[in-house]
């Protein structure tokens, strides 16, 4: 049984202590006897029950720990079928650039993108903005999980492409990888792609601090919905061909509105809290 499915079963199993038995999926229901053969290298076919357990377990696990990229990836794959990933694939097929991406099957990694080249580009270019965002956040292009649980081979590539382009969405919007930034970007992605995982990720707003939650409702949620719905489908961007373009020009082309700088907002709030604390201590003394 795939490790992610076992993780999902363990998470669901913990519900036994708080839920009636009718809510529990017994491990006896899980079987590999009806598992079809893989459709592509690395593919792990799942039975309906396994897919359901994977969806429930990964949803609970990723809510408890939003930094578990493997669980978020599993949730995305388990909930993308039978409709949503096909809708996204059809959106690519209906777009000339999307069709080229499906034909060429480009991959985004440190092997396909030269970091040195990106750093040599003009400061306001897409490529330089992307690599500067990677440097600032301390991440790289090789951190994305490989798709395993989507049955259709072409749709599996669509999910892989979405996953590998995620950091470009971060870079173009300027949103950091802190939970507040991820929730805001996932809201944008949900409005733009309709992938269920991006919508379910919005429940992580419950883990935000009160002031962060208020900021999300008042500032980033309206931005994400407005910009995600108004912009062109970002899955159809051939990022490898846009690296030298001015990033503001690309935002205008796609119809993406850049949100307020979340890192600067958080820094300003910390400075204000520090100053207020110092003022209180001075007054008390």
From Swiss-Prot:
Taxonomic superkingdom: Eukaryota
Pathway stated in the Swiss-Prot or TrEMBL entry: Cofactor biosynthesis; ubiquinone biosynthesis
Membrane topology classification: Peripheral membrane protein
Entry GO CC: extrinsic component of mitochondrial inner membrane
Residues bound to Zn(2+): 166-167, 170, 182
SS bonds (residue pairs): none
Interval spanned by the transit peptide: 1-11
Alphabetical UniProt keywords: Lyase, Membrane, Metal-binding, Mitochondrion, Mitochondrion inner membrane, Transit peptide, Ubiquinone biosynthesis, Zinc
E.C. no: 4.1.1.130
Main localization category: mitochondrion
Subcellular location: Mitochondrion inner membrane
Cofactor: Zn(2+)
GO biological process: ubiquinone biosynthetic process
Pfam families xrefs: Coq4
Reaction catalyzed: a 4-hydroxy-3-methoxy-5-(all-trans-polyprenyl)benzoate + H(+) = a 2-methoxy-6-(all-trans-polyprenyl)phenol + CO2
Subunit structure: Component of a multi-subunit COQ enzyme complex, composed of at least COQ3, COQ4, COQ5, COQ6, COQ7 and COQ9.
Family: Belongs to the COQ4 family.
Function: Lyase that catalyzes the C1-decarboxylation of 4-hydroxy-3-methoxy-5-(all-trans-polyprenyl)benzoic acid into 2-methoxy-6-(all-trans-polyprenyl)phenol during ubiquinone biosynthesis.
Name of the protein: Ubiquinone biosynthesis protein COQ4, mitochondrial
